[in-house]
């Protein structure tokens, strides 16, 4: 008996990333319907979808209600917050396939402390010196150990705005302590880690829980305003060369990035007993 294919797709989220996903789905020659559960009205998405509804994308019950109403067979979750809230878990439980990891596996993206601890636990060669804090105890001694080469990162999701780098955002240990104290005041866990010097790039991989297919290497530009003079954002734009690499990378660099993503996916599978399904985001220097 041939399995009936359900080509009713749900895209969760309504930013530029989700617009690109909707456009890719829309270009498919297959007969399909595209639905979007959005946080705001995006006219580009509205032009491509059969329905766009504003709702609480972090609430599993709301998402499932929309899925059941429209007979969705596969959901693609763009933002990280719904993943952190367990929306993917809830969708799988209702029989809907999901591009996006379950809550435990998503910690590789939603918790910087978890990511560092995982790399350290599995001896993956991509981990600078770091410590995790939930109070000010030990903050100053560790800053003094690192000297002027440190980065302070809010542990959770902050839309690309939770990272403060010595020299760029923090001009002294006193300023670093003030930022750390602000995180403690909002009950936030944070990490302080060694500042790495070099060109940053990202390499993402599609994962079906069994293997990975790698995307081109890209360089992400996060700072707002002309001349990169503004604060960090979730991303102002990216670029990649025609050969799917970048001018400052060679084949060995790309292979190392591939291997780190593969090792990370394998570590997650070993730790939680199931594979990571979704887009694995690797950030490198």
Regions found by a protein language model. Name each.
Residues 147, 164-285:
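Internal nucleotide-binding/catalytic subdomain
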Residues 51-59, 130-135, 166-171:
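Short acidic-hydrophobic, aromatic-tinged amphipathic segments that line or gate anion-handling sites
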Residues 11, 36-37, 76-77, 98-101, ...:
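General beta-strand structural signal in soluble alpha/beta enzymes
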Residues 1-104:
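ATP-binding N-terminal substructure of ATP-dependent carboxylate-amine bond-forming enzymes
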Residues 66, 142, 179-182:
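CheY-like receiver
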Residues 67-72, 145-146, 185-186:
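Glycine-rich phosphate-binding loop signature in dinucleotide/nucleotide-binding domains
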Residues 99-162, 167:
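A conserved helix-loop-beta module that forms one wall/lid of the active-site cleft
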């Amino acid at each position: 008996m041939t399995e009936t294919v359900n080509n009713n797709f749900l895209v969760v989220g309504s930013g530029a990333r989700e617009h690109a996903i909707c456009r890719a789905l829309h270009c498919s020659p297959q007969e399909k319907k595209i639905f979007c559960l959005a946080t705001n009205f995006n006219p580009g998405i509205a032009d491509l979808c059969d329905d766009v509804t504003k709702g609480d994308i972090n609430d599993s019950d709301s998402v499932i209600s929309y899925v059941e109403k429209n007979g969705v067979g596969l959901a693609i979750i763009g933002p990280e917050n719904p993943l952190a809230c367990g929306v993917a878990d809830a969708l799988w439980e209702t029989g809907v396939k999901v591009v996006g990891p379950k809550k435990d596996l998503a910690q590789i993206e939603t918790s910087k402390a978890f990511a560092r601890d995982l790399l350290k636990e599995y001896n993956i060669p991509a981990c600078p010196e770091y410590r995790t804090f939930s109070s000010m105890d030990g903050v100053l001694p560790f800053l003094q150990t690192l000297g002027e080469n440190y980065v302070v990162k809010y542990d959770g999701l902050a839309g690309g705005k939770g990272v403060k780098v010595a020299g760029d955002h923090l001009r002294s240990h006193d300023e670093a302590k003030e930022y750390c104290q602000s995180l403690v005041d909002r009950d936030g866990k944070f990490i302080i880690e060694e500042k790495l010097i070099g060109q940053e790039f990202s390499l993402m991989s599609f994962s079906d829980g069994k293997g990975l297919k790698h995307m081109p290497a890209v360089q992400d530009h996060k700072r707002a305003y002309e001349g990169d003079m503004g604060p960090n954002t979730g991303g102002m734009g990216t670029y990649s060369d025609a050969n799917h690499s970048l001018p400052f990378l060679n084949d060995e660099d790309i292979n190392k990035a591939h291997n780190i993503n593969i090792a990370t996916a394998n570590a997650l599978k070993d730790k939680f007993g199931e594979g990571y399904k979704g887009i694995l985001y690797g950030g490198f220097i």
